[in-house]
Amino acid sequence: MTKFNIHKPDDKLRQAIIDKIDNLNKPKGSLGRLEELALQICLIEQTLSPTLHNPCHLLFGADHGIEREGVSVSPREITWQQMINFTRGGGGVNMFCRQHGFKLRIVDVGVDYDLAMYPDIINRKIANGTGNFLYESAMSVEQYQQALNVGAEMADACFNDGSDIICIGEMGIANTSPSSIWMSLFGNIPLEECVGAGAGLDNEGIRHKYEVLNKAIENFKSSGLDCSNTENIIRYFGGFEMVAAIGAMLRAAECHLVIMVDGFIMTACAIAVSRLYPDIVDYMIFGHSGDEGGHARMLGLLGAKPLLSLGLRLGEGTGALCSFPIIDSAVRMITEMNNFQNANITKYF
């Protein structure tokens, strides 16, 4: 398996960054969370003058075999229909990318539809959806590696374009199901506390979803695989788009890019990848606490402090994109505000 070189950002500049922030012409600590963000971004980029050049949004799309079990209110074809919609600029993700100046890369990692005629969709299809993890592993070891490589390739493309920051989103009907299982297994949380409505299930739908996922976990535990192995859990239940997102996160951290994390699905990916490389969390900014059941609890498992709480549950990376102006403000604070000396203001503390 590909190994990534992930370490905490070097701390040698920490005190110099703190001193710069504290000497800006404001009361010490008065810009609160923005000061914390500025420190984090400076450490990621290893500079006292960070930038957010060429922001890039990666959107990975794929289908899930578990959808066949009726765990989602949305039909399977919504995945490919939305992928096409994104090429026409009509999705929520398109609007927020335009608003905040992000370049959008749309990547087919495993959509159950032929999208080859759409040149704005990058074709990295591994298969027409994953296997049904109620009965078998969602993907093989080889497919897992392929998906990681696709994500790393796309993060490399952003880095080579001069990006300092990437956002990652997904499109895949039924992908709250593997996310709920990852939350349960990686967080040691009872499954019933991890299963929510997804795109809009009613109480009976949630009950059915729980029963399917619970049986899938039982089958996994009797499969003969090492059920404590993180990568086994990821590939047995995960989607191609989710593993690609993990690969993108890992390569982005290697490149010292700021990683914007979205909602329930992407936070599940963050938990999964943190079990492989714990230091990666230091490269992540969590955009929001969403409305999908369990998201706030997942954020707590990571010790994350989300920037927004707007009741969002669309996915696609939209919640993270909404938080970008706050991140931008943090960078502008440390790069554009004057300090006490240059402003001829008495430093009174």
Language-model-derived ranges and their functions:
Residues 1-349:
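N-terminal loops that bind phosphate or other acidic moieties
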